[in-house]
């Protein structure tokens, strides 16, 4: 049933507030969702999206005064079981599956079928396998009910979560950043499933920071800011400028605006020649100039991250040269790269970039703490001053520099990592998925920093899976396919940087068309 066929909302959350010690996370928030609707929920990290959904899912109890209605009936959701019984299912970024159990066992978890006595009888795994065959077929799953979850890909595990929601007859499905771990092809398949569920009458609440996904899927979009409800836009009224202004509370015109001067083609900062490893990168060459922002695009698995790590010296290369200015450095030496003025921001900040159990101050200073050494001890005051300056310069939202990095939002974590790299005074900066998992406000700050660096003559390489981002920030774009540079767009090639051109190079369709003619 579509929204147009059902004038009555399926879900109404009215006047929802939630207070934690010293923090009011939600203040009188309301949300209305119809059956057969994809309703996106947007807001910066810390806006209250997750808190609102945790109240809906029974993980949190709202403060007194608000109410939740399903089909017009007030519901008391006092825990996850009550939410499930009310027809609410949530698929979090961190999937909630038991890897050592089968698909069927995960679908039936907490509702196991038993032989004989329903409470004490032995689990009837064969009956559970039969019982979930229909839902797996309905979702076009390529695996069976007896498959061990641990053997499935992330996309397939996500499908198990969706199957569990459908099997429990959920009517309201919440999806929190579901495409973050997925490839482009897996994302397309997920979108087909979401649309299918909408046609079947489910109400889908979709949380994402990705504008392209919001435009593609949403029937309506509601925005939260600082724990309050800002407003709801119909699909026909959506625009990036309007959504961003609602989220951050101010107008951000020219979201991707290039504010640096054209780069100097006569001032070469980085020269990479015929670089290769033994698997994923096959003889790539590139140049980067002072004040230039060079984008690197391509499909997942094309070798973009591998190329960046080879250039930086984080992975061994079997051949090729890397030169910063006139300095060539070794085949496997990040220290030499940093000394030459080349730094790399990893795509996985939590596992490869940050020390989550250490303070903001220590994370910012760790790459340059040798500067503060005095007679065998560290000048802590100097490090504290450096951290304060970085917090102010990059607009890092944090009470003070002693807070652990693990407690910060994704956007603020990314800015802490970026500030650490900038303390080394780089000439070349490689940013691998710099805005992944960060909110709109943090994205705009990162774009501002990129522009400022380019204006100062730093050469910046941006690797991104978001085509609007690549097109918006880059002077030139290199497109990778199967470990090689498939083509170049923009700059002095006079070839326009467009999504169609990037996709054609990334998929090989441009080459296929040329061969056909």
Swiss-Prot record:
Entries under InterPro entries matching the protein: AAA+_ATPase, ABC_carbohydrate_import_ATPase, ABC_transporter-like_ATP-bd, ABC_transporter-like_CS, P-loop_NTPase
Protein's UniProt name: Ribose import ATP-binding protein RbsA 1
Record family assignment: Belongs to the ABC transporter superfamily. Ribose importer (TC 3.A.1.2.1) family.
UniProt entry tagged with the keyword Membrane: yes
Function (record text): Part of the ABC transporter complex RbsABC involved in ribose import. Responsible for energy coupling to the transport system.
Taxonomic source organism: Burkholderia lata (strain ATCC 17760 / DSM 23089 / LMG 22485 / NCIMB 9086 / R18194 / 383)
Record key words, sorted: ATP-binding, Cell inner membrane, Cell membrane, Membrane, Nucleotide-binding, Repeat, Sugar transport, Translocase, Transport
Superkingdom in the source lineage: Bacteria
Subcellular location: Cell inner membrane
Subunit and interaction comment: The complex is composed of an ATP-binding protein (RbsA), two transmembrane proteins (RbsC) and a solute-binding protein (RbsB).
Gene3D superfamilies per UniProt: P-loop containing nucleotide triphosphate hydrolases (3.40.50.300)
Catalytic activity field: D-ribose(out) + ATP + H2O = D-ribose(in) + ADP + phosphate + H(+)
Residue ranges constituting the ABC transporter domain according to the UniProt record: 11-251, 263-507
GO cellular component: plasma membrane
SUPFAM superfamilies: P-loop containing nucleoside triphosphate hydrolases
Gene name for this UniProt entry: rbsA1
Enzyme Commission (EC) number: 7.5.2.7
Membrane topology: Peripheral membrane protein
Example GO molecular function: ATP binding
Residues that coordinate or bind ATP: 43-50
